[in-house]
Amino acid sequence: MANSASGMHVNDECKIKFLELKAKRTYRFIVFKIDEKAQQVQIEKLGNPEETYDDFTSSIPDDECRYAVYDFDFTTEDNCQKSKIFFIAWSPDTSRVRSKMLYASSKDRFKREMEGIQVELQATDPSEMSLDIIKGRLNL
């Protein structure tokens, strides 16, 4: 069982689907939620490769905390196709205090178990994870 110091247990399915996103590019994004009763992080939504960044942001609830990973494709100045895996810790101001604390205390453990995250973003408002912010983190 997890405790607040070490963070919530990460369900094996989360790790498997993340590896599929990273290695096989089976998914564009994954949204994760903490199930307090089960004491673990679980998958809430898998985004198909053809889904857009707007599809991704609309799948995250406005007033509840979530973790998410997004495989962002981009073209460099010298015309190379690349991708970076973003980790987004979504903790809106309108979410419950207990939920914010739970997600904050479990974040490091979650990231450790999702090996291959390249860029981290903390957002409390939709503007903090806009496409412009994402591109800015890539220096595009």
Curated annotation (Swiss-Prot):
Pfam families: Cofilin_ADF (PF00241). One of its GO terms (molecular function) is actin binding. It is found in: Cytoplasm, Cytoskeleton. InterPro entries: ADF-H, ADF-H/Gelsolin-like_dom_sf, ADF/Cofilin. The modification Phosphoserine is found at residue 6. Residues 7-139 form the ADF-H domain. Expressed in the root trichoblast cells and developed root hairs. One of its GO terms (biological process) is actin filament depolymerization. One of its GO terms (cellular component) is actin cytoskeleton. Keywords: Actin-binding, Cytoplasm, Cytoskeleton, Phosphoprotein. Belongs to the actin-binding proteins ADF family. Actin-depolymerizing protein. Severs actin filaments (F-actin) and binds to actin monomers. This is Actin-depolymerizing factor 8. It comes from Arabidopsis thaliana. The gene is ADF8.
